[in-house]
Amino acid sequence: MSTTITRRALLAGAVALPWLAACSTGPDRTAGVDLTEGTFSSRFWPGHEVRWRLARPAASGSVAPAQPVVVALHGHGGDADWPFASVHIERHVAPTGLAVATVDGGDFYWHARRSGIDPGALVVRELLPLLAGKGLATDRVALIGWSMGGYGALLLASRLGPRRVSGVVATSAALWQSPGDSAPGAFDDRQDFVRNDVFSARPVLARLPVRLDCGSEDPFIAANRAFARGLPTATATFDPGAHTETYWTAQAAAQMTWLSRTFTKPAALLP
C-alpha cells in the first residue's frame, strides 16, 4: 500500500505516519538500558490519562550519581511512544550515559491553549518532578524534539533558560515567521502566536547551546534558515534530507552525543 504525505500535513508539523502503528508494541529492549513507563492524571490536561516513558542506563549495582536526562518531545500526531518507535532514541542511551524521557503532549504545540490544556506546564511541573522522584538529575535537563516537538523544545528551553537547560536540539522544527503562515490549529489566534513566538525568544536561546537540524528538502527549511540567521550562536546543520523518519533517525546519534557534551558546560553562559 502506498502512502502520500501532503505538504499541508507536513506544514502542520505532522508525524502521524503508518509506522506509528508499531508504537503499541514498544521498542525492542536494548542492552545496557532499563525501560520503564507509566501514566498520571494531569491538571494541565484534564480528563486525559497521560502516558510517559523512560529509557535510562542500566543500573550497575553500585550507588551512582543521578543520571542527566533528555526530555524528548514528539511531533503532531505522536505520543510518548513516538521517539522510540520512530528514531529508536533508546539506542543512544547507553553510549551517551543520558536518560531519555517522553510524554504524551497531544497536538497542542507544547504551549498553553485557550482550552486550558498546557502540555508545556505538564512537562515542567509534572513530568520533571516525576523523573526527579526516580533518581534522575532534573536541576538541569536537555531537550530534543522533532517537527512540532522541535518548536516545543525551543519554546520550553527559552522559558526555562540557561540555568535549567543544558542544551536543546530542534530537528525539522515546525517554525513560521508570521501568524498567517502557521498551520491550522497550531495557535489559538494571532495573539497566541505572538505570545509563543520562538523567533522573539532568540535572545534567551543565545545564552544556551542550541542545535538546529533540518533537511534541505524539508518544507520548514526556509523558516529554519531564517531562525538560524538570527541565532549565530546555534550549531546549524542543513544537509540533504526531508521531513521523514529516515532523516530524523540518521541525525539521532550525533544529536544525543552533542547533548551529552552540553552537560559539561557551565550552568549559564551569562550571569
Where are the model-predicted features located?
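Non-catalytic cap/lid and distal C-terminal segments of serine-dependent acyl enzymes
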Residues: 9-18, 24-271
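Twin-arginine (Tat) signal peptide motif
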Residues: 1-11
